[in-house]
Amino acid sequence: MALSLSQDRSFDDDDSVDGSRPSSAQAAFKVPKVPKKPAESASSSRRPSATGAAKSGASKEGAGAVDEEDFIKAFTDVPTVQIYSTRDLEDNLNKIREVLSDDKHDWDHRANALKKIRSLLVAGATDYDCFYQHLRLLDGAFKLSAKDLRSQVVREACITVAYLSTLLGNKFDHGAEGIVPVLFNLIPNCAKVMATSGTAAIRIIIRHTHVPRLIPLIASNCTSKSVAVRRRCYEFLDLLLQEWQTHSLERHAAVLVESIKKGIRDADAEARVEARKAYWGLRAHFPGEAESLYNSLESSYQRTLQSCLKSSGSVASLPQSDRSSSSSQESLNRPLSKWSAAPGRVPAGSKSSGSPASLQRSRSDVDVNAAAGAKARHSGQAGGAGRVTTGLTPGSYASLGRLRTKQTLSTASSVGSSQVDSRGRTRSKMASQSQRSDDSDCTPGSQSATPVGAGSRSGSPGRVLASTALSTLSTGAQRVSAAPGSHRRSRIPRSQGCSRDSSPTRLSVAPSNISHIYNGSKGARGSRIPRPSVSQGCSREASRESSRDTSPVRSFTPLGSGLGMSQSSRLSSSVSAMRVLNTGSDVEEALADALKKPARRRYDTYGMYSDDDANSDASSACSERSYSSRNGSIPTYMRQTEDVAEVLNRCASANWSERKEGLMGLQALLKNHRTLSRVELKRLCEIFTRMFADPHSKRDPRGFGTVESGISSASFKRVFSMFLETLVDFIAVHKEDLQDWLFVLLTQLLKKMGADLLGSVQAKVQKALDVTRESFPNDLQFTILMRFTVDQTQTPNLKVKVAILKYIETLTLQMEPQDFVNTGETRLAVSRIITWTTEPKSSDVRKAAQSVLISLFQLNTPEFTMLLGALPKTFQDGATKLLQNHLRNTGNTAQASIGSPLTRHTPRSPASWSSPLTSPTNTSQNTPSPSAFDYDTENMNSEEIYSSLRGVSQAIQNFSVRSQEDMTEPPRKREGDGGEETVDSGRTALDNKTSLLNTMPLLSSSPRPSRDYQPVNYSDSSFGSSSFNKSLKDADQEESLTDDSGVDQSEVVAELLKELSNHSERVEERKAALCELMRLIRETQLHVWDEHFKTILLLLLETLGDGEHVIRALALRVLKEILNRQPWRFKNYAELTIMKALEAHKDPHKEVVRAAEEAASMLATSISPDQCIKVLCPIIQSADYPINLAAIKMLTKVIDRLPKEGLIQMLPEIVPGLIQGYDNSESSVRKACVFCLVAIYAVIGEDLKPHLSQLSGSKLKLLNLYIKRAQSGSSGSDQSSDVGGQGL
């Protein structure tokens, strides 16, 4: 059965909904509504016409699409208006700006306002000087309109800015710079009218506004993850190189070279075509740079460039079917492809306008029912309908293989060539960055038919086995013949199960042979009933039958019988030596591994697109990922990915598959020792912090893995496992820069040890903990662990407690005695650990806590003794009992241990202490905690022991008295307890470490000072560091103190934070919580804030984005209050806090803006001036109104705090932004710049003058006037009115 011409449509013929083009010829050709023969289409001109009529209208782009011709018609298709005066024009423009700046106006009003701008332009608005001033003010309105959700508003906005560019040319430079990034965001839009409007507007701007600053804006999008955006970018670069003069390009020649270089290596075939066209445009302007670029390319890319030059010159250098589409909503109703073949490339007998359909895959991201319907409609296609005969299996693509050898491919005498890349597999339609092309990208109609699973996306082990055993792959051109009546399926595969093409039917040439081999399928053809696509979630079992490379069929199908191929050819040595597995055991191993892994979800990412699964989990032994895992090499596409921002974007993606690939890219960068900048580090730490919060347990309560969730829980665990691997590399490379993040890292890893994780994942968490322990300073880790132990916001479960204790215990083995510091936080932590020795629910916790106490005692005996002396009697009794029991149990004391108190004991035996941080449920049985120490009392008689005990008892009593004071101060003499003599005698006794093990029993009978610290309740659930520290500092004024108030305050703060985390919910409750928090700031002791400050700051900054303006204003006032009372805490958060405070000035509510101004003013007086200036200067130069205004005002306050010498050094950073602001269209910004310059002059005097050389004479005169007024004592209000009067 042959398909009729009218039915033969490709799923990819039409443009994707993200705005991608149907072929590389889009910018140059107008496709008529009636399909024409391919020969008629290839003779068109390569370049667009001067009017920009690159037709991409409805006939080509689909319903709703617009092009430049439509724009040109719409420019003047507007109501007629008349301009009577300058005032009349200003009134009209002000009304227009008011309507466009408020998206609450009805959408048709906004569309009419945009049309009215064009009406005014037609009426001659450009002849009025005031128009250009108002045009600057309209920038924000244009941006807002281009972002509108209504397509009609977006279309009118694009037409209007295009018309402005056409009329004003380079005078539209400022507007073009602002609007182009917004227009780029329209390109991947699923609404064609939006996507094509943005594209047409950018084209017109490029043609008429030749501003060099546009080049970086375009080039920055060349690394977009959207394939549609990248294609357009290279097309725009080509247009720009064609239209602009060389002098306009010179400044950014390096950017152009680098962008084109990336494009030539792009993963998308069509993007590569556009980049190659741009290369020849670059060569016309900069032959030297182009030559250098050419020489830096690999030979395969050089050949491709040359072959494109030698070709017909037509843009149709690629068949339309050889392209990718990133759309997840693409329509199945496609028009006929115009570029099915280029004339002269394919023998006439093999030409057919229906060929693309025979080479397309089904799409799993579209409606499966529609795909199944399309399959049914095309099921009777005959053998002669396409360029390639029966040998081409479903899923074949226009450019199926890439050959890396230097052999010239013969396309004149053969229908297609079978090319094998370095993987020893055929190449799918979408080329990854690791698959370098030769000339098939550039050769229309050079379809290849590969014998082994032609066109499938990954070479499974089975394919390699088949190719090796049967020797059916060849390095040269292979002919594929077919009898007219040969048995074959339709080449329109259906979406089945978890992949776009079911494995059993890939090799559909011999169904009878397949059916009895592949046991997992229900026959070679499979069911026509559509199954849920992977985007709806698929289980591992489902993927067995339908994933793209889990079928054993490919390795055993008798290819020769169905394909009529020559089996005498051999794999080239270069291919087989690199990638082909030659041993059967390797193949079996890899096949088993591949069968265990589920299919990869389809999506589009940088360098690895939907049809390239070189890195999918289901990839086979010959894929990049599995190959690199055996050989330790890094995948090629990862080696080429140097765009860290792109990698970080993927790591931060909500899509778990993208996140996985982002982590892989990050791993590759880290293994190449690519260091990250401070900003990149900060962002990556934030991303990792969020990843820790994601669910990864074996039994997650949120129901992941359902159809609704779209991804199985196994995927979460795989990504988390990869995250842990990346984390280890990240710590190893950047450990010197991560000390500020260590608290989050360490605490989150310890929490994960208490989660219900798989054994393999838990082992990776353990490895990360081991690396962390070895990478950071011991004293810093110890301080963090102490803080974490007493953190009131944490409620660790039993496993987490064991993990914390084991980590502390292991850490003490590598700590030096001086690393143990006796602080209030440490005393609290030790108290809590003592309570854990009586944990009723877990013997593991009890044993681990006992081991930690003994380890700490062993680490620094004098300090630990002092610490115990500061604790309440109940805690001393518990520690005494533990240590005494330990001594009795061991019965041994090493004589060598008697000596200096700073001498470390012999490390614990490896047999019992080798891995204290293994699984929390198993370690305690393997760790005989107290008995592991080797103490020896045989050489000491009882009199020595008891005399030592008496001395230590007195010393501890003395330390108990001193515990009310700061332990860092020298000991004070106290009447009645022996003064310094007692201390000395105690220290002498401390020299004998063994004696301390028997010291504690005497404490119960010895008298204690009246000011002993005796908390009422020191239970596990109520530790309060604030009252404890207060008692240490204020003991001389208070006779007794309980820690109830401290516990209450800390608990109150924790409850408030919990309430504040309900973003955009429970408004009244959160208002009350913020008010209470402000009260606590004024009353609470600082030690409570030691625990909670970071959490409070994070929540406050997040609350600034709340939906309620009252909440936003309150959050700013709380922030201001903290800044007022505890400014030193913001040292490490200055940049983030300043940015958030400045952004709050954009708030539409005046109450929030006032609060933001107060917070910014407090920041200017609280944060270090140097820090402020480093943050503010870039903002002043780059931010828009009103953020730049707020930054300038803040800078003015900061300048008042700077000394003359420091300010003079910083002038090169400060003054350029102020001079730029002096020209701002907003009068308030100009005023603020003048006041700031006056403030600078007040500090440094005439030293400012040399930096003002760029100012015009009138502006200098005006500045001098206000400097004189300031010197004469004019008030700020007078200055404000005067400056306004002078027309600043």
Swiss-Prot record:
It is found in: Cytoplasm, Cytoskeleton; Cytoplasm, Cytoskeleton, Microtubule organizing center, Centrosome; Chromosome, Centromere, Kinetochore; Cytoplasm, Cytoskeleton, Spindle. InterPro entries: ARM-like, ARM-type_fold, CLASP_N_dom, TOG. Residues 638-889 are annotated as: TOG 2. Residues 1036-1046 have a biased composition (Acidic residues). HEAT repeats lie at residues 174-209, 210-246, 251-288, 718-755, 780-817, 1047-1086, 1091-1128, 1167-1204, 1209-1246. The keyword 4Fe-4S does not apply. Residues 406-421, 468-478, 496-518, 891-900 have a biased composition (Polar residues). Residues 1-62, 314-571, 614-634, 891-936, 960-1047 are annotated as: Disordered. Its main location: cytoplasm. Gene3D superfamilies: Leucine-rich Repeat Variant. GO terms for molecular function: microtubule binding; microtubule plus-end binding. GO terms for cellular component: basal cortex; cell leading edge; centrosome; cytoplasmic microtubule; Golgi apparatus; kinetochore; microtubule; microtubule organizing center. PANTHER family: CLASP, CLIP-ASSOCIATING PROTEIN 2. Interacts with microtubules. Microtubule plus-end tracking protein that promotes the stabilization of dynamic microtubules. Involved in the nucleation of noncentrosomal microtubules originating from the trans-Golgi network (TGN). Required for the polarization of the cytoplasmic microtubule arrays in migrating cells towards the leading edge of the cell. May act at the cell cortex to enhance the frequency of rescue of depolymerizing microtubules. This cortical microtubule stabilizing activity is regulated at least in part by phosphatidylinositol 3-kinase signaling. This is CLIP-associating protein 2. It comes from Danio rerio. The lineage of its organism: Eukaryota, Metazoa, Chordata, Craniata, Vertebrata.
